[in-house]
């Protein structure tokens, strides 16, 4: 079992859309980080690349599952449209 420095709600993280990463300030001066992909897979621990601290991320896994399902449906529709054009 991990010992968490803190428990932080996902809403308190900063989201970088380009990198699809969530960031939260670490006491060491760097930032805790966790990727959107890790959250979709059910990961709940954000790590700091500069020190040994970890935090538990509080979030609703269903929120990310629904978003993943939406993306899959959109990609499928785009694929169908490309086939229709040819």
Curated annotation (Swiss-Prot):
Q: Which reaction does it catalyse?
A: [3Fe-4S](1+)-[protein] + Fe(2+)-[Dph3] = [3Fe-4S](0)-[protein] + Fe(3+)-[Dph3]; 2 [3Fe-4S](0)-[protein] + 2 Fe(2+)-[Dph3] + NADH = 2 [4Fe-4S](1+)-[protein] + 2 [Dph3] + NAD(+) + H(+)
Q: Source species, please?
A: Drosophila melanogaster (Fruit fly)
- Record's Gene Ontology CC terms? cytosol; nucleus
Q: Which cofactor does it need?
A: Fe(2+)
Listed under subunit, the entry gives:
Component of the 2-(3-amino-3-carboxypropyl)histidine synthase complex composed of Dph1, Dph2, Dph3 and a NADH-dependent reductase.
Q: Name one GO molecular function term.
A: iron chaperone activity
Please quote what the entry notes about the protein's domains: The DPH-type metal-binding (MB) domain can also bind zinc. However, iron is the physiological binding partner as zinc binding impairs the protein electron donor function.
Known role: Required for the first step of diphthamide biosynthesis, a post-translational modification of histidine which occurs in elongation factor 2. Dph1 and Dph2 transfer a 3-amino-3-carboxypropyl (ACP) group from S-adenosyl-L-methionine (SAM) to a histidine residue, the reaction is assisted by a reduction system comprising Dph3 and a NADH-dependent reductase. Acts as an electron donor to reduce the Fe-S cluster in Dph1-Dph2 keeping the [4Fe-4S] clusters in the active and reduced state.
Protein's recorded name: Diphthamide biosynthesis protein 3
Q: In which pathway does it act?
A: Protein modification; peptidyl-diphthamide biosynthesis
Gene3D superfamilies assigned to the protein according to its UniProt record, in alphabetical order: DPH Zinc finger
Residues that coordinate or bind Fe cation: 26, 28, 48, 51
Q: Name one GO biological process term.
A: protein histidyl modification to diphthamide
Matches recorded under InterPro entries: DPH3/4-like, DPH_MB_dom, DPH_MB_sf
The segment(s) forming the DPH-type MB domain are 4-60
Which family, according to the similarity comment? Belongs to the DPH3 family.
Q: Which UniProt keywords apply?
A: Iron, Metal-binding, Oxidoreductase
